[in-house]
Amino acid sequence: MWRSFPAPQRPIAKTGFSSAWSKELVALLKNIRSSGEDALAMPGSIYGAIGLCQFMPTNISHYGADGNGDGVVNLFTVPDAVASLANYLAQHGWNKAATRAQKQKVIKTYNRIDIYANTILGLAEAQGYVAE
């Protein structure tokens, strides 16, 4: 796989086979290549999460979705970030008919903190998006 990278990037790509953090780096490099993003201008968390929905780079290939139909998954655009997060939640069991407890469990696959899941559900309920 690392041979598919241009020669100057191969040493970095090779590390993808030796450690957990390097898998995130390799996934990030692949995403940058396909999206055309500027790697030096790309903001991210101290843990490596990127985009409006703060996905780890390895999650982009699994859950990233092209929400605006431009053929590119760019988690820094609202349509793609929303579509990607919706895809993530759907693949983890979200459905409209689920109970509040089931929905909370799905949200906690994204962020394990109880207060986070309760806040998201509370905000959604206040806006009429989720049945109480």
Where are these regions (language model features)?
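Catalytic glycan-binding domains that act on GlcNAc-containing polysaccharides
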Residues: 1-132
